[in-house]
């Protein structure tokens, strides 16, 4: 493998098409980059995961720390919101829980927004729709 690296490093190469690029017409020589192959000494060992003391992976006495806190978001407390407000949002937000209805709502909303914007956009944005702004200049014989 070392002989291939030294062989590639000794022979310079000429790039075609660049011979006449300089004023004198000299050829451009490029030496390829020398590549060296290094072997890394890597120690291989067993990977050990530890939990707590003495490599205990699952502790039946401490389920909360073993499996995580599952009831972080759960609460038995009554809702802090007004019951009428909760009923309103449960009634009118229920159709938007399904993807199809939400998609239809977004399409209708986007279409109505596009219609409104296109109806209120100024019409004379392009010069071709405005027409000539100055009288035409006469040519050399008094013609347009």
UniProtKB/Swiss-Prot annotation:
Q: Where does the chain cross the membrane?
A: 104-122
Q: What is this protein called?
A: Photosystem I reaction center subunit VI, chloroplastic
- Purpose: Possible role could be the docking of the LHC I antenna complex to the core complex.
List the source organism.
Spinacia oleracea
Q: Which GO terms describe its molecular function?
A: molecular adaptor activity
What are the protein's UniProt keywords?
Chloroplast, Membrane, Photosynthesis, Photosystem I, Plastid, Thylakoid, Transit peptide, Transmembrane, Transmembrane helix
This protein's transit peptide sits at 1-49
Where it sits in the cell: the answer is: Plastid, Chloroplast thylakoid membrane
Q: What is this entry's stated membrane topology?
A: Single-pass membrane protein
Task: Indicate the family of this protein.
Answer: Belongs to the psaH family.
Q: Which GO terms describe its biological process?
A: photosynthesis
Principal place where this protein is found? Answer: plastid
Q: Give the GO cellular component terms, alphabetically.
A: chloroplast thylakoid membrane; photosystem I reaction center
């Amino acid at each position: 493998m070392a002989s291939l690296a030294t062989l590639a490093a000794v022979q310079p190469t000429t790039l075609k098409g660049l011979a006449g690029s300089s004023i004198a017409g000299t050829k451009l020589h490029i030496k390829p980059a020398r590549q060296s192959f290094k072997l890394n000494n890597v120690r291989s060992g067993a990977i050990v995961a530890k939990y707590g003391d003495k490599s205990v992976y699952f502790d039946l006495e401490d389920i909360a720390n073993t499996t995580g806190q599952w009831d972080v978001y759960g609460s038995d407390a009554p809702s802090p919101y007004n019951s009428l407000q909760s009923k309103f949002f449960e009634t009118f937000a229920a159709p938007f829980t399904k993807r199809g209805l939400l998609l239809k709502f977004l399409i209708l909303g986007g279409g109505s927004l596009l219609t409104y914007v296109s109806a209120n956009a100024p019409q004379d944005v392009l010069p071709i729709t405005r027409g000539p702004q100055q009288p035409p200049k006469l040519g050399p014989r008094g013609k347009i």
